[in-house]
Amino acid sequence: MANEVAKLSFWGVRGSTPTVDRATWRYGGNTPCLELITPDGKRLILDCGTGLRILGNRLAASPEKTIDAEILVTHYHWDHIQGIPFFAPLYSAQNKFHFYSFRSDFIGRDSLKRVFEAQMAHPYFPVDLQAMPAQRDFTDVSGGDRFAIGKTRVTTGWLNHPQGCLGYRIETPVGTIVYATDNEPGNLEYERNLRRLAEGADIFINDAQYTPEQLERHRGWGHSSWREGVRIAIAAGVRNLVLFHHDPDSSDKAIDGILRDARAEFENTWAAAEGMVMTLGEDQTDVVIPAVRDGLRREAHFRARVSGLRQDGRPFDQETVIRDLSLHGALIYLDHSPKLQSELQVTIENPGNGDHADRALRGYVVRIEPGPEKDQVGVGIVFTE
């Protein structure tokens, strides 16, 4: 029998508002939405930002006759609900969705349902919620509640965010995922909640909207930094930390720098990216980053020297040949497998007559695949400078 796994897919990772400019294309610009497929086949959707539209289009095109999902919503700010009107499966009567979130002191009874109705009310949207014939059920939960979805147990905890926010601890038969976005450090009660949620988690997804310096200038906005995530991850014995809810003004290069700083203190750190998939099994967690091809690539034959860190953290330095090159990235073959989302130093030998110096570049690892020769790996990189 095949080993059981839980599959976690990232459909939206940006915070506050979607971004579409070129400087953010590698990590992505859609607002929060994750999808978890549990070992017993249950589908959980975490938050309903604009990434929900992309997920919905994928589900609508799938061969599934009935789409059935449990949707856990952390809170009611725009970036966590704005995908609902564009979620294609809600417009098909055979589909079933069960929503969970908290009863807001500002809204009262049926808070989540009323929020969805309000954002689609006239004059804000062409049609209202009645245009969605899918079955919709709503359950109020509060901080500290526990409930089951199939063989998966869910625990909630209050986080420190304006107007309230829930974090979710999701314990599957093969491991634990904690989703704790939108939390500002500094309140002891909420710190204890977050620590309890994160305790021993295999995957800890945490708010990293700001740098530590930016955080000091944004007190009261309800967000955190990579340093706070690292601190909780170490204290709670987390296996993998995922930096999430990237600031809309953070470019890919800025997030690269945040990731480098975090990995210097906690090696098993990842920066959430649209299309990223984390597969959680009983023995390990595998991570796949989406392949990025944003320009015409040409077959090439440039000698190069590549240095970086292997997956076990040891350094390597190797001469190789680049065979697939564009202005934005390359495919290179190495004897050692580097860590995904790590930085490589690439020095390309000038193929001319020696009048020009070799070109030194930095590359960001976006994929790893089997190479053409035994004991080789193909490494896809995007040039960062």
Which functions belong to the PLM regions below?
Residues 1-178, 188-189, 194, 255-282:
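Binuclear metal-dependent hydrolase catalytic cores
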Residues 47, 79, 182, 207, ...:
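Acidic active-site catalytic centers that drive phospho-/nucleotidyl reactions
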Residues 53, 80, 212-213, 250, ...:
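Short glycine-rich, flexible loops that bind phosphorylated cofactors or substrates
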Residues 75-80, 161, 206, 223, ...:
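Histidine-centered active-site/metal-ligand motif
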Residues 77, 87, 210, 247, ...:
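Flexible, active-site-proximal loop/turn residues at the rims of small-molecule/cofactor binding pockets
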Residues 176, 184-274:
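Cap/insert and terminal regions of metallo-dependent hydrolase folds
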Residues 269, 285-385:
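Structured alpha-helical
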